[in-house]
Swiss-Prot record:
Belongs to the N-acetylmuramoyl-L-alanine amidase 2 family. The keyword Lyase does not apply. This is Peptidoglycan recognition protein 1. GO terms for cellular component: cytoplasm; extracellular space. Residues 1-18 form the signal peptide. GO terms for molecular function: cytokine activity; Hsp70 protein binding; molecular adaptor activity; N-acetylmuramoyl-L-alanine amidase activity; peptidoglycan binding; peptidoglycan immune receptor activity; zinc ion binding. Innate immunity protein that plays several important functions in antimicrobial and antitumor defense systems. Acts as a pattern receptor that binds to murein peptidoglycans (PGN) of Gram-positive bacteria and thus provides bactericidal activity. Forms an equimolar complex with heat shock protein HSPA1A and induces programmed cell death through apoptosis and necroptosis in tumor cell lines by activating the TNFR1 receptor on the target cell membrane. In addition, acts in complex with the Ca(2+)-binding protein S100A4 as a chemoattractant able to induce lymphocyte movement. The lineage of its organism: Eukaryota, Metazoa, Chordata, Craniata, Vertebrata. Pfam families: Amidase_2. SMART domains: Ami_2, PGRP. Strongly expressed in spleen and lung. Also detected in brain and thymus. In the lung, expressed in the intraalveolar space, in the brain, expressed in the Purkinje cells of the cerebellum and in certain layers of neurons in the hippocampus. Also detected in cells filling the space within the intestinal villus. GO terms for biological process: antimicrobial humoral immune response mediated by antimicrobial peptide; apoptotic process; biological process involved in interaction with host; defense response to Gram-positive bacterium; detection of bacterium; innate immune response; killing of cells of another organism; negative regulation of inflammatory response. The gene is Pglyrp1. Residues 39-167 form the N-acetylmuramoyl-L-alanine amidase domain. Keywords: Antibiotic, Antimicrobial, Apoptosis, Cytokine, Cytoplasm, Disulfide bond, Immunity, Innate immunity, Secreted, Signal.
Length: 182
């Protein structure tokens, strides 16, 4: 049985990751990033953009482009900072993806973590259930594909940097997740 599960995971059949919206679909600008992450990654850092929320594919694609534009054109980074962006439409938008180091949490955490951000401000409200479900599915996908350790740890952005991110309400939610560690 263990061999069958390992084979399914190796073939990518155990958990489908087809729910991830590729960069080409949300019309991302080309990335200029090249620093790669080593796998499997031990940490996942959850943040929020603290900006506008989105709840439809069109508005979330636009919001992902807005975040990328700000990071590339205003901050001068090589791409959108995050590995993945979560919309309240229930979709995961590919940022830098599983293989490229992000710019989401500073020089200590970026090389050893996947950065997942929820698009919107979650100080006073919880993200839609479908967005939370999408994030948990993404984490399962990462484990099944060997990008995340099976014993990965989820951290809130505020656990590793001085910030209010991921917002009070989202922070309260992620603290209940199985892999959350302060």
């Amino acid at each position: 049985m263990l061999f069958a599960c390992a084979l399914l995971a190796l073939l990518g059949l155990a958990t489908s990751c087809s729910f991830i919206v590729p960069r080409s679909e949300w019309r991302a600008l080309p990335s200029e990033c090249s620093s790669r992450l080593g796998h499997p990654v031990r940490y996942v850092v959850i943040s929020h953009t603290a900006g506008s929320f989105c709840n439809s594919p069109d508005s979330c694609e636009q919001q992902a482009r807005n975040v990328q534009h700000y990071h590339k054109n205003e901050l001068g980074w090589c791409d959108v900072a995050y590995n993945f962006l979560i919309g309240e439409d229930g979709h995961v938008y590919e940022g830098r993806g599983w293989n490229i180091k992000g710019d989401h949490t500073g020089p200590i955490w970026n090389p050893m973590s996947i950065g997942i951000t929820f698009m919107g401000n979650f100080m006073d409200r919880v993200p839609a259930k479908r967005a939370l479900r999408a994030a948990l599915n993404l984490l399962e996908c990462g484990v099944s594909r060997g990008f995340l350790r099976s014993n990965y740890e989820v951290k809130g952005h505020r656990d590793v940097q001085s910030t209010l991110s991921p917002g009070d309400q989202l922070y309260q939610v992620i603290q209940s997740w199985e892999h959350y560690r302060e």
